Amino acid sequence: MGKTIQVFGFPNGVSAEEVKKFLERLTGSGTVYAIKVRQPKKGGPRVYAIVQFTSERHTRLIITAAAERLYYGRSYLKAFEVEQDIVPKPRASLHTISGLKMFFGCQVSTKKFLTLWSAQDVCVSFGIGMRKLHFSFSWYQKDYRLELSYENIWQIDLHSPQGRSSKFLVIQVIGAPKIFEKEDQPINLLFGIMDFYSDGSDEQWIRTTDFTSSSCIGQSTAFCLELPVHLNVPDFRENFANYAEHRASSFLIESGSSYSSNANTLVPVVDPPPGFSLPFEILFKLNTLVQNACLSGPALDLDFYRLLNQKKYDRALIDHCLEKLFHLGECCYEPAHWLRDEYKKWISKGKLPLSPTISLDDGLVYMYRVQVTPARVYFSGPEVNVSNRVLRHYSKYINNFLRVSFVDEDLEKVRSMDLSPRSSTQRRTKLYDRIYSVLRDGIVIGDKKFEFLAFSSSQLRENSAWMFAPIDRITAAHIRAWMGDFDHIRNVAKYAARLGQSFSSSRETLNVRSDEIEVIPDVEIISLGTRYVFSDGIGKISAEFARKVARKCGLTEFSPSAFQIRYGGYKGVVAVDPNSSKKLSLRKSMSKFESENTKLDVLAWSKYQPCYMNRQLITLLSTLGVTDSVFEKKQREVVDRLDAILTHPLEAHEALGLMAPGENTNILKALILCGYKPDAEPFLSMMLQNFRASKLLELRTKTRIFISGGRSMMGCLDETRTLEYGQVVVQYSDPMRPGRRFIITGPVVVAKNPCLHPGDVRVLQAVNVPALNHMVDCVVFPQKGLRPHPNECSGSDLDGDIYFVCWDQELVPPRTSEPMDYTPEPTQILDHDVTIEEVEEYFANYIVNDSLGIIANAHTAFADKEPLKAFSDPCIELAKKFSTAVDFPKTGVAAVIPQHLYVKEYPDFMEKPDKPTYESKNVIGKLFREVKERAPPLISIKSFTLDVASKSYDKDMEVDGFEEYVDEAFYQKANYDFKLGNLMDYYGIKTEAEILSGGIMRMSKSFTKRRDAESIGRAVRALRKETLSLFNASEEEENESAKASAWYHVTYHSSYWGLYNEGLNRDHFLSFAWCVYDKLVRIKKTNLGRRQRQETLERLDHVLRFG
């Protein structure tokens, strides 16, 4: 018998809470895990409840009671067993220990703990599936609960000192617990009156910040529980590899004091002691080490600080050693001793290390980042960022800029309900106060005080902002004034968006004088009382100037048809017009504010971009009549292709070109073309395995299906006025055959992500217009009709949006729907100039009202559950709410989600095993289960072992005289591997293949693939370019083959295996050699050809001799 039953016969109107109270009178308090109260399909005066208990014993009890007559009031109840649980994997608390004393503080040696604060009568609970520890206690008549996730624990030690009546469980952490306080008034709401879910967010517990004096919880890097010596402690080894027991060893707990800077409300932040001055970069790194538990804050003594004196020690040596400390993977309790030993090692080598930082190209900058959580602060970086207009202009003061992100203790986004609880949407918690106060008061690091500057629209979505520390009379206000004139904007949301316009990641190209541009009229109409702008966000660029801009962007093989730009106060797209005589023709819809800046900044351009379906698109196409079998066929084709790349060279070559264009792909294609087999050459095999694994994972988690008959394209306008309403021009390039172009005619599906309304999917007619043949890799829309097609697609425009364009006729739906009305809500206009305090408050309010993810997930769940799919009432209502939420950064009008749109249970493909779940019968459920077993969450890729090194070394890569260059090659590879490994550790990326290809399976929660993939890719490319420049530093061109051969030798030969990244527990990396892939491929082809000719001659000689 299972844990779940159906109890029928309750009167209509009964709530889940009433059912729970009634059943627990028989089974005992806390025995009901989840309840769903539902109406029978035929209706009637009686309802039934599906009830999941914590134990099978309780289900038997209720079924037995019902068999012997069980009444609820006057209602006679029947009970039946149910096969499927409401929650497949409930998080059960199996262990609870009460009456403990808990110390908060820092471990300063393996046997000594310094306490900063302590709590009495603590109750700790944990169990299978929970993946977290709960600590509950009272302080000054308030009830508190700390929730510490397993991911924030890096080591647990149980100390049992001899002759003591207590033993001590020390939990060392790399992150703070979430802190809750209990509401004084009990609240009954959990998941709505018809559902109960015991492990849901108990509304009585409200998130709060560190309530101790000096923020001792946030300063603590370890928690120590004092346990009775006779207490049996559960075995933690199952969940923690770093669990150890120390019997009969000494263990001391001593009183300590706050070690964090008094200049900051944020903790922990350390300052050097009086009389010591550290450069900002070293102080920042030192704080990074303390905050990430690489160093113990109280253990930093004068001796340690003396070793950071760059007048006495080489700066590159200091930087290298501090960087290595970060990557050791453990806390160093004697940092002065460790540093001395490292210095001696390098000095004895007679060759100091190179700087651990990677040399960057123009357009890239190193930026420092600070993450603020409810209880702590984390410094990170410097990390590679694409530059922007402001950073370029103030490049002299780059270290005075700071990126600040507000995240939760698990480093994921703060939830809106943590700032404003569902029980009272008008209320604000202390988390809200903390975010607002940091924006208002700034952050102090050493002698710099960073103050709020601005944020871009993408930063706002990530809860991130820019800060600046005043220097040389330049302040944040000074920078905002330089950016442009915003005084005419009286709406806070729009004002903030215009400030952020200058912070878009971009590359500077050419200067354009005011007499070289023209302002041309917009194309607009009034239709049914609504003003539509067909040219919203788009202008023109002359063909000659476009070619110059392309060259400035480093594009030598083609000149794009359109560029996404920023120019002065203008933003949007400029498309090539062969007839234009002015460099730029801009429209009023592109002008957002006045600015004297005349530099043309480019954000993106039209190019080949592969096309993928996702869950939203599949849902809408399915709603509009595309059959399930079509989607299943498309997914199967992708999976078959991914399987084939591991063994078939031609399949691998084609798949890489279509699905993963880029510099890295060129290396792999070159290896295939020179004869290497996908399943034999270790580097090629590793990269292809990762490519397959990452694409399979995307299929499982996002249903992201590659469509060969489609492209992702930038939207443009037909400036010739040739196209009629309902027509588009679609011309695409072929990545496999550069220079080839193809014009599509016939029906095409056009949509813009995100898309939730069935009307967002447009079926248009692609036509051939010779006057528009210069427009390649973009979709050209007409300027005729009652409404612009881009506006019909999710309320989009032409300022840089990328559209899904598909000409695969199997995916053209048999019917379409009227598009939704995307007229934004009226904006609130102030009676005064917007103040920067109002912008800061708006930022905090955005987090409170950020509901995009909640609405999108709810839409996915309802569309799967409802018979009408995306046409159902809940989905249409959610689509409207989503539009309001999308416009919030422009209007300041929030989307309020009513209770009936909260998700009660999730389809299995959303993979929420700790929530009420059912097996989806619709297309996404089918696709998910078809690929689920082939795409586990983590797919292991074979490491380059000593055995593989012995078998795979290619003698064809040896060139006469390579031995002369081996020592230098070894030094360069050691430097390269150290930097590459540092990047992997910093971003939390496990394998070399992932960071090189961008097919990242899992990364640190500080980062997201969507937001940080470009920066990671640029950092890797910069490292490769730096390494290549070292190869080219000598002018001995005639010996470059021997030098390249040496690079291969120190990478692949078994005698060099395991000699790199000493003491850092890293894999043996292979990519170093392939930084000079063109030279290695040439060597391979030359030696292969020579060997084949020799073999042919030997065979011919054999025939001539022996017949």
Swiss-Prot record:
Q: From which lineage does this chain's organism come?
A: Eukaryota, Viridiplantae, Streptophyta, Embryophyta, Tracheophyta
Q: What's the top EC group for this one? A: transferase
Q: Which GO terms describe its biological process?
A: defense response; positive regulation of post-transcriptional gene silencing; response to salicylic acid; response to virus; siRNA processing; wax biosynthetic process
Catalytic activity reported = RNA(n) + a ribonucleoside 5'-triphosphate = RNA(n+1) + diphosphate
Q: Which gene encodes it?
A: RDR1
A Pfam family of this chain = RdRP
Arranged from A to Z, the UniProt key words for this protein are: Nucleotidyltransferase, Plant defense, RNA-binding, RNA-directed RNA polymerase, RNA-mediated gene silencing, Transferase
Up-regulation conditions:
By salicylic acid (SA) and infection by a crucifer-infecting tobamovirus (TMV-cg).
In its UniProt entry, what is this protein called? RNA-dependent RNA polymerase 1
